């Protein structure tokens, strides 16, 4: 990871603390993974206070694949089967079947509809019948060991929103360039400056959890 580009956001601990403050104030953050992994940046929002405008931003500037990061216990609560029995994807991303709110939406595609689906899914009393399958939101089941076991965006999103005091449920969407290619660190930094968003890395989170959060 290019630490020179990231230095304007502070050192690793500062980046985590700034991200926590941003999420608490209702903003989103951007999480980068390792250059040797996916080498991508994801927009990340806490499900509980995400707005329609933020969902629209994710759809417009992201890949369009809006994912809901959830725990295994939430997956079981909603009775969501994994998308495939044998996961052969490169990083074993934990896709479940896609979902749609069974009430309160139209086609399920709009920013408002996708956010309604997410708010429905994360409700404490959510039931399997509250969701239709398939749909336009992609739930991702996080590894139970978090980023220490799987250093992916799914786990990182749940870690950072939990550190900010929210339910362990986050929305992620990969940032892309105007030409449809994946945004890399220089483009991601430029985007973050334009949108005034905090940037952190999965390695920052791992360092924080090992050295600060577990003291």
Curated annotation (Swiss-Prot):
<dbReference type="InterPro" id="IPR000422">
    <property type="entry name" value="DHBP_synthase_RibB"/>
</dbReference>
<keyword id="KW-0464">Manganese</keyword>
<dbReference type="GO" id="GO:0008686">
    <property type="term" value="F:3,4-dihydroxy-2-butanone-4-phosphate synthase activity"/>
</dbReference>
<keyword id="KW-0460">Magnesium</keyword>
<feature type="binding site">
    <location>
        <position position="174"/>
    </location>
    <ligand>
        <name>D-ribulose 5-phosphate</name>
    </ligand>
</feature>
<dbReference type="GO" id="GO:0009231">
    <property type="term" value="P:riboflavin biosynthetic process"/>
</dbReference>
<feature type="binding site">
    <location>
        <begin position="150"/>
        <end position="154"/>
    </location>
    <ligand>
        <name>D-ribulose 5-phosphate</name>
    </ligand>
</feature>
<keyword id="KW-0456">Lyase</keyword>
<comment type="similarity">
    <text>Belongs to the DHBP synthase family.</text>
</comment>
<dbReference type="Pfam" id="PF00926">
    <property type="entry name" value="DHBP_synthase"/>
</dbReference>
<dbReference type="GO" id="GO:0000287">
    <property type="term" value="F:magnesium ion binding"/>
</dbReference>
<feature type="binding site">
    <location>
        <position position="38"/>
    </location>
    <ligand>
        <name>Mg(2+) 2</name>
    </ligand>
</feature>
<dbReference type="InterPro" id="IPR017945">
    <property type="entry name" value="DHBP_synth_RibB-like_a/b_dom"/>
</dbReference>
<feature type="binding site">
    <location>
        <position position="38"/>
    </location>
    <ligand>
        <name>Mg(2+) 1</name>
    </ligand>
</feature>
<feature type="site" description="Essential for catalytic activity">
    <location>
        <position position="174"/>
    </location>
</feature>
<dbReference type="GO" id="GO:0005829">
    <property type="term" value="C:cytosol"/>
</dbReference>
<comment type="pathway">
    <text>Cofactor biosynthesis; riboflavin biosynthesis; 2-hydroxy-3-oxobutyl phosphate from D-ribulose 5-phosphate: step 1/1.</text>
</comment>
<dbReference type="GO" id="GO:0030145">
    <property type="term" value="F:manganese ion binding"/>
</dbReference>
<feature type="binding site">
    <location>
        <position position="42"/>
    </location>
    <ligand>
        <name>D-ribulose 5-phosphate</name>
    </ligand>
</feature>
<keyword id="KW-0686">Riboflavin biosynthesis</keyword>
<comment type="function">
    <text>Catalyzes the conversion of D-ribulose 5-phosphate to formate and 3,4-dihydroxy-2-butanone 4-phosphate.</text>
</comment>
<feature type="binding site">
    <location>
        <position position="153"/>
    </location>
    <ligand>
        <name>Mg(2+) 2</name>
    </ligand>
</feature>
<feature type="site" description="Essential for catalytic activity">
    <location>
        <position position="136"/>
    </location>
</feature>
<keyword id="KW-0479">Metal-binding</keyword>
<feature type="binding site">
    <location>
        <begin position="37"/>
        <end position="38"/>
    </location>
    <ligand>
        <name>D-ribulose 5-phosphate</name>
    </ligand>
</feature>
<protein>
    <recommendedName>
        <fullName>3,4-dihydroxy-2-butanone 4-phosphate synthase</fullName>
        <ecNumber>4.1.99.12</ecNumber>
    </recommendedName>
</protein>
<comment type="subunit">
    <text>Homodimer.</text>
</comment>
């Amino acid at each position: 990871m290019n630490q020179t580009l990231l230095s304007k956001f502070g050192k690793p601990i500062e980046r985590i603390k700034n991200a926590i403050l941003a999420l608490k104030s209702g903003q989103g953050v951007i999480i980068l993974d390792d250059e040797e992994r996916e080498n991508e940046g994801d927009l990340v929002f806490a499900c509980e206070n995400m707005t329609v405008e933020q969902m629209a931003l994710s759809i417009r500037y992201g890949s369009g694949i809006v994912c809901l990061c959830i725990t295994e216990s939430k997956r079981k609560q909603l009775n969501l089967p994994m998308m495939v029995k044998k996961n052969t994807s490169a990083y074993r991303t934990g896709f479940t079947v896609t979902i749609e709110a069974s009430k309160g939406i139209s086609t399920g595609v709009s920013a408002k509809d996708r956010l309604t689906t997410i708010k429905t899914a994360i409700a404490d009393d959510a039931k399997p019948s509250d969701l239709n399958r398939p749909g336009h939101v992609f739930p991702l089941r996080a590894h139970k060991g978090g980023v220490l076991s799987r250093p992916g965006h799914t786990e990182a999103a749940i870690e950072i929103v939990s550190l900010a005091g929210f339910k362990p449920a986050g929305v992620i969407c990969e940032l892309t360039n105007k030409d449809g290619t994946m945004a890399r660190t220089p483009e991601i930094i430029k985007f973050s400056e334009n949108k005034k968003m905090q940037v952190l890395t999965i390695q920052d989170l791992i360092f924080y959890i090992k050295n600060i959060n577990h003291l």
